[in-house]
Amino acid sequence: MKHTGFPAALIGLMIAACSPASEDSTGAPAPSADATDTSHTESMTSVAINEADLRHRISTLADDGFEGRSPATPGGIAASQWIADEMARIGLAPGYGDSYFQPVSLLAVTLEADQSSFDVAFEGEPLGLSMGEDVVYWSKLNSSEISVTDSELVFVGYGVVAPEYGWDDYAGLDVEGRTVVMLVNDPGYANPDSGLFNGNAMTYYGRWTYKYEEAARQGAAGVILIHQTAPASYGWNVVSGSWSGTQLDLAREPGQGTFSDIESWVTEDRARQMFDLAGLDFDAVTAAAARPGFEAVPMTGLTASGTLVNSTDTMESRNVVGIVPGTTRPDEYVLYTAHWDHLGSREVAEGEDGIYNGAVDNATGTAAILEIGEAFVGEPAERSVMILAVTAEESGLLGSAYYGENPIVPYEQTAGGINIDAILPSGRSRDVVVVGHGASELEDILTEAATEQDRYIVADPTPEAGYFYRSDHISLAKHGVPMLYADGGFDLREGGSEAGMAAGEDYRANRYHGPADEYSADWDMSGMVEDTTLFFTVGSRLANSDAWPNWYEGNEFRALRDAQMGTE
């Protein structure tokens, strides 16, 4: 998920003779000559970062021939094959043994809504929660039928266990077989000036993904997450739209992964009703949940029951991995990530456009990491550089999550990484926005490189929305690897902040996650070239140094990195 509410742009020498990456013959579609930038051919790309190369790669990836690059579809297979072929052509070594492909198995789970039910009852009387209107529920278990019966409800505040903040909402609590009810975001959001957590800036503990993970670790049978628009940073329409229909997850062997039986969201209105029935003052109890010393509260008389009938299917996709070997320390790595997938295509009326090309999101990022990879081939660094184009970001960061669980390079040999996700073609900016500002020492390298471009660093303007936790770098951060997530800013050199904000809003309102997100020859590529150069410079300095950046003191991932590197 991109931070499209942001203004403007927020939102090998040793393998010269390697063979092409054409490892399969799928009969999948190929880019159409009339839609790609045919003024610039693949054989003309240069090790110098430049506009023509970026245009060629973006226009190719965003072409109708790839049908929106949805994973495990003919278009997605063809797009990932093109990326692998491009890596081979420009001189990157295969990153997964002798292959450019790291296989990623995906599990598609479709809730059979007409055969499924989930409700909360008070003293045996169902509340009558309506799917989509009041509640959205699902299960990630690879099972055709999942049942929970008369599971007692308990309010666990924010559902957080954060030792570095001295916080444990599950302290002394046994939730085995029970259904936990919790708030979105973290205590710092409710008390931005209290010094709790990271104040108004969301931490990983505020993300819904963490909350479901922690509840499962605690043994909860069910999870009910209370939706509130401000702390979630999106309305109920996003919840009801995003968690209905087929859901994708990583396909795991039996016993792998930990999930509660049923996960759900409920509207605030219905949550207030539940609290009232349990004799609890919603405002008072939720306020107490944001203060140190909070203890979980049983929701007396309330139980949850449900039977979910699922149909499941396993699909195969792949991450695409290329490496530029290091000249003196090839076992140490700097990582670049971008997701290659988008939303595919939809059936529409004749004459309408049903292909979601994803030109900005994220043909731009994929093109940028290929451009950076080619630049490193021309200028190899002391450390190796890995170019990782991941699948299924739009389905929940699944490709990067798979890499996170199955790293090709040990984390203690990965010095750090840079994620590129959606670069708006709105021109050069005076600023660079760091999403999740104040996270890691990679920002020190970025600040120096940006200053040399006569640019300044600004913090993410809406830290409470937790955008740092919504793109692929988080899958590496969760395993301790310092990751940088930055974008060109909104203070444009032509038009200033007003023009930058207008460009960002125009994209968010008219093209983001829609069929209108298409490449245009009219794009102003100057900012994209500058940003890509900046990200190359940051990675090059790290790859040519002996530095091992860490997360800043107090960051939720610092302890992981310290343990990894033996610096506890």
Where do the PLM segments sit?
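Bacterial signal peptide processing site
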Residues: S19-S22
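Noncatalytic luminal/extracellular "stalk/propeptide" segments of secretory-pathway proteins
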Residues: M44, E67-D193, P298-T300, T312, ...
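Catalytic-core environment of secreted peptidases
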Residues: A48-G95, T110-E112, A121-E123, D174, ...
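Soluble metallo-hydrolase cores and metallopeptidase-like ectodomains found primarily
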Residues: A113, A121-E123, V135-G172, P254-G358, ...
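His/Asp/Glu-rich mid-to-C-terminal helical/loop segments that flank catalytic regions of hydrolases
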Residues: L370, E374, G378, R383, ...
